[in-house]
């Protein structure tokens, strides 16, 4: 039998339990065709990069499949008919990864906070900082008194 990876994106307005049921239905479809699901990962409700069928978010589900080609074709047909599935993609692979996917490893990292961290929270006191020196001069600081602008030409002829 061939090895496949399948990623589904389900509508944002269905519950986690319904997504889990959808995964069970996929397993049942494949077992009817003589295949099996070796790994199932729920990546959660994630924001889509662009709207798909009027949805801005979607439930992501990854499946590692060991099944013959006719079972995978039947799965593809049923996923196209399922209104809860926004998008799906099934790819044939050489071998299945047993380790958690990159998306799950990214979810295991601790939260880093915002882009600039916690501005006013547990920030250590910096104490007396030394003078940073002259900040003008070659950096364009105060240019002093400017010379007079002199006579200005009109922008277009006839205008004064």
Curated annotation (Swiss-Prot):
Recorded GO CC terms: cytosolic small ribosomal subunit
Keywords of this entry: Ribonucleoprotein, Ribosomal protein, RNA-binding, rRNA-binding
Q: Name one Pfam family in it.
A: Ribosomal_S6
Q: Which domain of life is it from?
A: Bacteria
Q: Which GO terms describe its molecular function?
A: small ribosomal subunit rRNA binding; structural constituent of ribosome
Q: In the UniProt record, does the keyword Ribonucleoprotein occur?
A: yes
Q: Where is this region: Disordered?
A: 94-160
Q: State where composition is biased (Basic and acidic residues).
A: 106-160
The GO biological-process annotations, alphabetized, read as: translation
Purpose of the protein: Binds together with bS18 to 16S ribosomal RNA.
| Family that this chain belongs to | Belongs to the bacterial ribosomal protein bS6 family.
Name by which UniProt lists this protein:
Small ribosomal subunit protein bS6
Please spell out the taxonomic lineage of the organism that makes this protein: Bacteria, Pseudomonadati, Pseudomonadota, Alphaproteobacteria, Rhodospirillales
Q: Which gene encodes it?
A: rpsF
